């Protein structure tokens, strides 16, 4: 199987991007890009570390990623599985990327930059939700930001409610855990307890 191994080979196949693909790139958060961030309730956080790459889902109420200034984003580290893979990566390699999604919109927003992890008490308190503060906040310096064309969203028909997958056709978290652990953890009881456990630990 022929493998593409050089930039020249790639450009011979794809050519050069059009002006619209390059002029949209900024090194700061422009007013239109701020609107997209403020409207987004979900982002994927990509990080890298000595063990490899990680991509973590991040979600909260719209605007959960705070625009501190035109070069700085702040994102609370809400409750999760406590693996802290992303944070472990950031403290050793500051390179990060974010991909914002906005329900109903074909536009996605890509942000590349560097990040630090802060446990400043006043900063944590400013992100309290239902009286609960995050344990840390990710502070990101924006180096590159631009919106992505809508073709992937259009092709996938992502926001079409008629295309939603029936959850009953998917393995449950309890089933996956039972399969991976030879039934030591997970199972039906895990799935039964999950909704209430999640409700009590969202923040």
Q: Where do the model's predicted regions map?
A:
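Binding-site signature for planar aromatic cofactors or substrates
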Residues: 1-203
